[in-house]
Amino acid sequence: MENILITGITGQDGIFLTHKLIKQNKNFSIIGISRQKDYLPFYNKLKLLGTNDFSKIKILHTDLTNKQAVDLLIKEVSPTRVFNLSGPSSVYESL
């Protein structure tokens, strides 16, 4: 089974990527990283897109600026693919 790691999974791009991957109906698990602690809005947005099967998704709250935490996560998850979609949610913060 393939393990797909998505950073920024609860953001706009993460939601659309997750929806697209689940629609492919392939044998994989999705491990999402989010700085958010409330995942309900993420699942509600997936429902609006027509995704109702969340069995392949596991979301973790991890600090991506902590190298040791990220190294441990990579060892534990052993991802076959990584999509890095994390970043500031404000244009002003990204300047």
Predicted regions and their residues:
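N-terminal Rossmann-like NAD(P)+-binding domain of SDR-like oxidoreductases, especially those catalyzing
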Residues: 1-95
